[in-house]
Amino acid sequence: MNVYPPFKDKLEILSEDQIFSVLVSFDDLSNRDKFIKKYNRLDIISKFDFIPSILVNLKKEQIFNYESEALIKQIEENQIVYPAMLDVNKILELDDYKKSEISYTGKNVKVGIIDNGINEKIPALSKVSLKKFKLYDVEKPIKENGEISHGTVMASIISNRFEDSDGNYIGIAPNVKIYDFDISNSHQEHSFNDILRVFDKICEEQINLDIIFISLTTKNSSDGKDLLSLACDLLSDKNIIIVCPSGNFGPNYYTIGSPGAAKKVITIGALDKELSISNFSGRGPTLDKRKKPDLCFPGSNILVPITNDLRLNVSGTSVATATGVGVIALIKEYDSNITHDLLMDLFNKSKID
């Protein structure tokens, strides 16, 4: 069976004429290239090397016609991924900041953030070590303090350079090196193929990362066998810790999307101020009945200072995940050799159920 089962179920109830953006994956690059040669009239939008696959637009009939093709490993929908942050409310004037007594600051830890770009010009990110990678050539109007994208908020939670009354940076890991993988585009919508292109870039350019933070998730639940989840598992095998939100589609069970359902990513849910699971936080199990999320961090009504006159009150599992990424960066600074499995052992021994 070559059609990904959740996608096949969806196809059964949709019209014959509808065109789908689909990802076709293969066991290896050789099979992919043989397929392209065999079906040379097929209009291929993109090719991916890290996990051998192509992006094409197909009708329902075409998808089922390819189902018996031996060269194909799997056909699935190129699903849209959504930022896992809820409403943002602007609040004027800053309060005093919580004193930080942590001796580690994430120094020399490399964190890749896959999101819609980071505005490093805001005061909160002043002098943060940041390297930009732009996936698409799209011009965005950048205002010095006005471009507050989802990615900017995520980076501000991790590396905020505002100081508390004792002169400590309030960011959880203010000295990490941030790699900004900006997947923003002209239609302001993101799909699996955007993240797969980032993975190709990381591998092709041999970008050395310790942590990858994917702050996006699908609406549809996943069993961890979709292409993006499988790609995350493969990248994790390169000793990169991948961290994802559980999504904001709770409180029902089976609301973990992709890539949060991947077996080798650390999936994080959100807690409210009383340290109870937030109502919106995605719940497990995954579609194949594995326990997720792996951890929960505070993610409801978190105040994030952006400028001297502006702070944001933010909620969402991506907010909780940014907090988790900061904590993981501190641990990574302490033990640069720690792996995903050892990190999970550490969390499992210290977490409160």
Locations of the language-model features?
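Structural detector of well-ordered beta-strand residues that form the stable sheet scaffold
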Residues: E76, Y179, I241-V243, T267, ...
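Catalytic-core environment of secreted peptidases
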Residues: L125, L130-K131, D272-T321, D345
